[in-house]
Amino acid sequence: MTAALAAIGGKWKLIILYWLAESPKHFAALQRAMPGISQKVLTQQLRELMSDGIVNRDPKGVVPAPVVYSLSEYGRSVLPLVENVRLWGRTHLAVRADKDR
């Protein structure tokens, strides 16, 4: 459990994985998809995910060099967990809404 949380825990990593599961993305597209994340934090989170082999960084061979981030094959193995967390979150919101009524 500790190793899993170290690799994909925190406020932003699962959200990054969610958006990359949809399709590879440029840095700016990821940042737009996640209001509230700073450039510094997104950079740090992507570096950690790359270091763990979960995300690939693919610089294109033009100048200025646009970089595309994508899930690695290993990173795709996390997608069932990402989907389960997403579904649990929807259920949790519904339970809280019912409780507040």
Write out the residue ranges for each language-model feature.
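Short amphipathic alpha-helical/adjacent loop interface patches that line ligand
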Residues: P24, M34, L46, G75, ...
